[in-house]
Amino acid sequence: MNKSTKAERSKQLMSTLPGDDVRQVMWRFSDRYDLQMVVQSTREVARGLIANLVANGARNTHDWTPEKNSILTAFDEAGLTQVFMDPADGGFIEGPKNLALALVAYELAWVDGGAATSSLASNLGLSPIHEKGTPEQRSKYMRMAVPPQPGEDRQIKRGAFALTEPLPFVGVDTGVVSGKLRIDSWDDGQDPVFHVEKRGRFI
C-alpha cells in the first residue's frame, strides 16, 4: 500500500468516527449540559495551546518549561482543574466525576497524550484526601487546589504523585530517577507543604 492509499484510507476512517451528537447519545450525556461544556472547553485548550506547543517541539524535552507550565494555567482558565472537585469545594459537577474526567482525557489525548496525563495528575494527588480524609481535610486541601476566585489573593496549590516502579512493569526507569524533597512552608498548627522535584527517563 503506497502513501497516498494509506492517507486516503485514514481519511475515510476518520470520517466514520462518531461526531459529538452521536457520542453524546452513545455515552449518555446528551442531556448533561455541564459535560458538553467540559468537552468544548477541553477541545479549545487541546486544539489551541497544546497543539501549538506540540507543533513547536515542546514534547522534545522532559524539562519543565514555562511553556509547559502554561498548560496548567490554561486548564485553570478553562475550568478543567475544577472538574474533579465537588461543588462545595469550588467544582461545578455534582456526583461521580469519572465520565467527566474521561472526556477531558479523551479530548486532550487526541492532540497529546502527555497533556491528557497531566490533566489527571493533580486529581491522583488529591484522591487520597478526597476518599479518606476527614471532612475538614477535604474542605481545606481541595479548596486550595481550585484556582482563586475573583477577590481572593492566593496561589493555587497543585496535587502531585510520584510513580517509581521497576521496569519492565511501567514506563519509568527507576535506575535513573532522582529527586529532591524539601519543606516549602510549615506554619504553626498547620500541615507541612512540600516542594518536590523529580527527574528521570520516561519511556
Region spans (language model):
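Glycine-rich, Trp-frequent "lid" loop and neighboring beta-strands that shape
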Residues: Q137-I203
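Amphipathic, small/basic residue-rich leader segments at the start of a protein or domain
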Residues: M1-L120, K140, M144-D153
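N-terminal leader/propeptide and maturation segments of large enzyme subunits in energy/redox metabolism
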Residues: E131-P135
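Short, conserved phosphate-binding/catalytic loop or strand-edge motifs used
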Residues: L120-S127
